[in-house]
């Protein structure tokens, strides 16, 4: 009892303007930075999922590729969440993009540069000042290697895919920070999900290629000479059959045209194409089986005899 009385007495002896625990009315309440349950560190650019769980933006990005579900409650993540995330502190993104004149690290994207998040940028700067040749970074669940001699980055298990990096001041023009676009680029953001773990928009090339019209090449009409010429010959009139054969031959031989036409030019007209001699065309148009036509075929073959081998007129 005495102890309690002493404590009460000592507390009552304090001045009235001083208390044991007195919050400062003028100071803003300190907001503790939440911890990420994926990387087990303090959140960098924390985002809140529809299920109210909070993670780093890049951690959510990496986890969504595996199953597109929350890492804690397994609730489904919306399809457009990575393009329109719910940031807990948007002013933090603005301050990180502006900086105070110090240096920052960037990785190359399509049509611009992305700034690393603050934690990764500090790790790169620390390795650079210590003179290290390379360092490893954990970004969106993937382990990357930063080659500080050649200024490139690549995944540790995939050396073929490389991306340029650089060290520059914070105030240079940029696309965004850690895959989060700035407000100036919000109107131009593509709703398609970006396919790179570090925020590079590789899907823009697919959209540009799909917007270009695909040329349609016209097809040539191939004419079969053997079938047409065989039906064109008449037993009664050899002259008319020759005229019909020449009419069919003027359409064009696919073999001749194929030799003169280049790749992708099948629909263009032939220019300066050399036509074969009439005797050769007649030989090609002649049917292989001469037994079906009888004597008219023999008369037709006599027309193909060279002039030097013919007998003069009047000699039997």
UniProtKB/Swiss-Prot annotation:
Keywords for this entry?
Cytoplasm, Metal-binding, Nucleus, Transferase, Ubl conjugation pathway, Wnt signaling pathway, Zinc, Zinc-finger
Report one GO cellular component: nucleus
- Domain WWE, which positions? 91-167
> According to its UniProt record, in which pathway does this protein act?
Protein modification; protein ubiquitination
Q: Per the annotation, which location comes first and is thus the protein's main one?
A: cytoplasm
* Molecular function terms, GO-annotated: poly-ADP-D-ribose binding; ubiquitin protein ligase activity; ubiquitin-protein transferase activity; zinc ion binding
Q: Where are the zinc fingers (RING-type)?
A: 36-74
Q: Does the keyword tRNA processing apply?
A: no
Catalyzed reaction equations: S-ubiquitinyl-[E2 ubiquitin-conjugating enzyme]-L-cysteine + [acceptor protein]-L-lysine = [E2 ubiquitin-conjugating enzyme]-L-cysteine + N(6)-ubiquitinyl-[acceptor protein]-L-lysine
Q: What superkingdom heads the lineage?
A: Eukaryota
Residue ranges, compositional bias (Polar residues): 293-310
Any single biological process term in GO? Wnt signaling pathway
Which stretches of sequence are listed as region Disordered?
257-316
Report what the protein is called.
E3 ubiquitin-protein ligase rnf146
Source organism of this protein record: Xenopus tropicalis (Western clawed frog)
């Amino acid at each position: 009892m005495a102890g309690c009385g002493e404590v009460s007495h000592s507390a009552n002896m304090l001045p009235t303007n001083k208390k044991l625990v007195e919050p400062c009315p003028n100071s803003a309440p300190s907001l503790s930075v939440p911890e990420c349950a994926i990387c087990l560190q303090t959140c960098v650019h924390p985002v809140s999922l529809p299920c109210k769980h909070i993670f780093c933006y890049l951690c959510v990005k990496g986890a969504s590729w595996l199953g597109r579900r929350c890492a804690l409650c397994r609730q489904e993540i919306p399809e457009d969440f990575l393009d329109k995330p719910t940031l807990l502190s948007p002013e933090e993104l603005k301050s990180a993009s502006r900086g105070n004149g110090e240096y920052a690290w960037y990785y190359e994207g399509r049509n611009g540069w992305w700034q690393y998040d603050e934690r990764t940028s500090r790790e790169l700067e620390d390795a650079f000042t210590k003179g290290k040749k390379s360092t490893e970074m954990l970004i969106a669940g993937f382990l990357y290697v930063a080659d500080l001699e050649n200024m490139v980055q690549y995944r540790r298990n995939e050396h073929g895919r490389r991306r340029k990096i650089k060290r520059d001041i914070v105030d240079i023009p940029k696309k965004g920070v850690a895959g989060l676009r700035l407000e100036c680029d919000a109107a131009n953001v593509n709703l398609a999900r970006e396919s790179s773990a570090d925020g590079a928009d590789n899907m823009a090339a697919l959209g540009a290629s799909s917007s270009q019209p695909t040329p349609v090449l016209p097809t040539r009409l191939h004419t079969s000479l053997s079938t047409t010429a065989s039906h064109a010959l008449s037993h009664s009139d050899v002259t008319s059959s020759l005229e019909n054969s020449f009419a069919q031959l003027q359409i064009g031989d696919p073999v001749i045209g194929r030799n003169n036409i280049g790749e992708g030019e099948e629909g263009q007209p032939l220019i300066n194409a050399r036509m074969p001699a009439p005797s050769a065309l007649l030989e090609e148009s002649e049917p292989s089986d001469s037994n079906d036509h009888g004597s008219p075929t023999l008369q037709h073959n006599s027309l193909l005899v060279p002039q030097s081998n013919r007998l003069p007129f009047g000699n039997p």
